[in-house]
Structures are given as C-alpha cells and as structure tokens.
C-alpha cells in the first residue's frame, strides 16, 4: 500500500490539484464552509478550545480557519535569553549537524543544503558545520510560524519546485524531498549568526505567507526569485523571539538552519518524532559573549 501511495505522488497533477484546493479553501461559501470546517475538526480531532475563535461559524473561509489564531497565553514563551524556542506546533522529523553540506532526511536519504537554499552558494557556506532541524506540521496543528530567536531579515528566496506531500511516509521514500518541493527561504541575522527559516510547500498547500511580503506568489515557472532587505535603519525588518513570521495555508514543513556553534545542545526531549509546541524550549544557545 505504501508503494501505491508513493506512486500516486509521482503521478498526480500536484500543482493543478493545489491550485484547485486553494480556490476552494479561499471561498466564502457560508453553510458549506462551516460544514467542511466541522468535518475537518472531527476528522483530525482538533482542540478548538485553544483557538481565539472556537466556533466553526466564526470563520468565513476554510483558509481563515486553517490559519486561526490561538488564545493569548495559550503557548507560553520561554523568555530565557539562553534558550531558543520551538517556532511551530508539530513534530520533529529530523535534526542534527550539517556535514559537508549534507542534511539528513530519513534512513538512506540526504539532501544538499545548497539545493535547499535555491543554489545560493554564499548562503550555504554560512551554515556549513552548523545544525539543522526539520519540523512537520500535520493537518491538526496550529499553522502559524514564529521566530525561534530575535532576528533581522536580510534575504528572501522563492524556489519553484514539486509539490509532493511532506508527511513521514514521503520523507522516507522520496529522495531529496525538501530540496525538491516549492519553498520560501528567509534568512535572518541574529546575535548568534545567520538563521535560515525554510518554509516548504506540499500537495494542496494553497500558499505560503510571510508577515513582511504577504502571500509569496511569483510568476509560474522555474525561475528562482530573491529579495534583499536592509538590516539597519528605519526599513529594517526585525522580529522578536516568538513573533509570527509566516503561515501555511493547509500545512507543511519548516526546515531551520543554524550557524556553526550557534547551538550548544538541543533541549531535553527534543529528538526525532518528538512533539513540538510553539514557545517551548527547543535548544540551548552558546553564550553570545563567548561566541564573539
């Protein structure tokens, strides 16, 4: 059965399907929208008591429901200056060192950090010898993405690609999955060096949004697009630890890359398949003064 599911991933018209689902998810269809939301809540056992608006009828579109806000304080933020926090609700797929520009995906599968970053060689060099973490957001999860540490945006890259599903099954079976799918790469400058937040698209993921650019929708094609941003002055975009930086419409995966020596150790319990909750401790940081 798994082989059949993987074969279907290669055969499906994934971009066409995603565009169709995107239009349906954005539609404001009244009772039909509410019925779809209620079905989704039941199917995926979503705890709506955490949502700022707990009633399905409050959402005019499925996208509005899927990108719902949480109640204030429902995800307490670890404010320890030596702690990096989880950026999302989800589950750790893999994490570990970046060795010779290679990132571990699953048993028997690695992919290139250079390819992941859209063949931006100078960017890839900045993360050599550092660490990575891949976090999968399931349909039931809260789908806003937050900053694990304070950072100032320096660059965004849109990389066109496939739209394979990014669930654990495809991660185990599709080579180079996260470096093949459509993605948005945001690079931030932090006290501990560069941080890359890679938002990976997937089948039926209608769109990827960032708080500074809105929905990232370059023209259809195979061209990589880059935007550079000032890191100083009134136009600099600085986001605090825990602040929202983006969101998925219909969910996917976040891959984070960290500079060499930025992380001392991952926090207790942070390992492959561990459940993550935004705001909780993710990693212990090297002391900034020592790093300098």
UniProtKB/Swiss-Prot annotation:
Active site: 89 (charge relay system), 146 (charge relay system), 252 (charge relay system), 252 (schiff-base intermediate with substrate)
Site (Cleavage (non-hydrolytic)): 251-252
Entry PTM: Is synthesized initially as an inactive proenzyme. Formation of the active enzyme involves a self-maturation process in which the active site pyruvoyl group is generated from an internal serine residue via an autocatalytic post-translational modification. Two non-identical subunits are generated from the proenzyme in this reaction, and the pyruvate is formed at the N-terminus of the alpha chain, which is derived from the carboxyl end of the proenzyme.
Cellular-component GO terms for this entry: plasma membrane
Keyword Cell membrane: yes
EC number: 4.1.1.65
Reaction equation(s) it catalyzes: a 1,2-diacyl-sn-glycero-3-phospho-L-serine + H(+) = a 1,2-diacyl-sn-glycero-3-phosphoethanolamine + CO2
Membrane-spanning residues: none
Main location, first listed in the record: membrane
Pfam families xrefs: PS_Dcarbxylase
Cofactor: record remark: Binds 1 pyruvoyl group covalently per subunit.
Cofactor entry: pyruvate
Subcellular location as annotated: Cell membrane
Membrane topology: Peripheral membrane protein
Keywords per UniProt: Cell membrane, Decarboxylase, Lipid biosynthesis, Lipid metabolism, Lyase, Membrane, Phospholipid biosynthesis, Phospholipid metabolism, Pyruvate, Zymogen
GO molecular function, one term: phosphatidylserine decarboxylase activity
Modification Pyruvic acid (Ser) occurs at: 252
Pathway the protein acts in: Phospholipid metabolism; phosphatidylethanolamine biosynthesis; phosphatidylethanolamine from CDP-diacylglycerol: step 2/2
Enzyme class: lyase
Gene Ontology biological process terms, A to Z: phosphatidylethanolamine biosynthetic process
Oligomeric and partner information: Heterodimer of a large membrane-associated beta subunit and a small pyruvoyl-containing alpha subunit.
Function: Catalyzes the formation of phosphatidylethanolamine (PtdEtn) from phosphatidylserine (PtdSer).
Family affiliation: Belongs to the phosphatidylserine decarboxylase family. PSD-B subfamily. Prokaryotic type I sub-subfamily.
Protein name, as recorded: Phosphatidylserine decarboxylase proenzyme
Species of provenance: Shewanella baltica (strain OS155 / ATCC BAA-1091)
Underlying gene: psd
């Amino acid at each position: 059965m798994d082989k059949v599911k993987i074969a279907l991933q290669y055969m499906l018209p994934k971009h066409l399907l995603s565009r169709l689902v995107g239009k349906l998810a954005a539609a404001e269809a009244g009772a039909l929208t509410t019925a779809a939301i209620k079905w989704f809540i039941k199917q995926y056992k979503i705890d709506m008591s955490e949502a700022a608006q707990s009633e399905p009828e409050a959402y005019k579109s499925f996208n509005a429901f899927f990108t719902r806000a949480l109640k204030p304080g429902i995800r307490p933020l670890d404010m320890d200056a030596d702690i990096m926090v989880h950026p999302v609700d989800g589950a750790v797929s893999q994490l570990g060192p970046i060795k010779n520009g290679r990132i571990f995906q699953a048993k028997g599968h690695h992919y290139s950090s250079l390819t992941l970053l859209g063949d931006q060689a100078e960017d890839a060099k900045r993360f050599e010898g550092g660490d990575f973490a891949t976090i999968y957001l399931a349909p039931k999860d809260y789908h806003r993405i937050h900053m694990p540490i304070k950072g100032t945006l320096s660059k965004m890259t849109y990389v066109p690609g496939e739209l394979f599903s990014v669930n654990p099954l495809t991660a185990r079976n599709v080579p180079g999955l996260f470096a093949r799918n459509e993605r948005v790469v945001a690079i931030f400058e932090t006290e501990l060096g560069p941080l890359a937040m890679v938002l990976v698209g997937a089948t039926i993921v209608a769109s990827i949004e960032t708080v500074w650019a809105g929905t990232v929708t370059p023209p259809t094609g195979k061209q990589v697009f880059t935007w550079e941003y000032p890191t100083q002055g009134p136009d600099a975009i600085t986001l605090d630890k825990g602040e929202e930086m983006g969101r998925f419409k219909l969910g996917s995966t976040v891959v984070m890359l960290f500079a060499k020596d930025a992380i001392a150790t991952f926090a207790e319990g942070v390992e492959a398949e561990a459940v993550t909750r935004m705001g909780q401790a993710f990693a212990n940081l090297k002391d900034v003064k020592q790093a300098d």
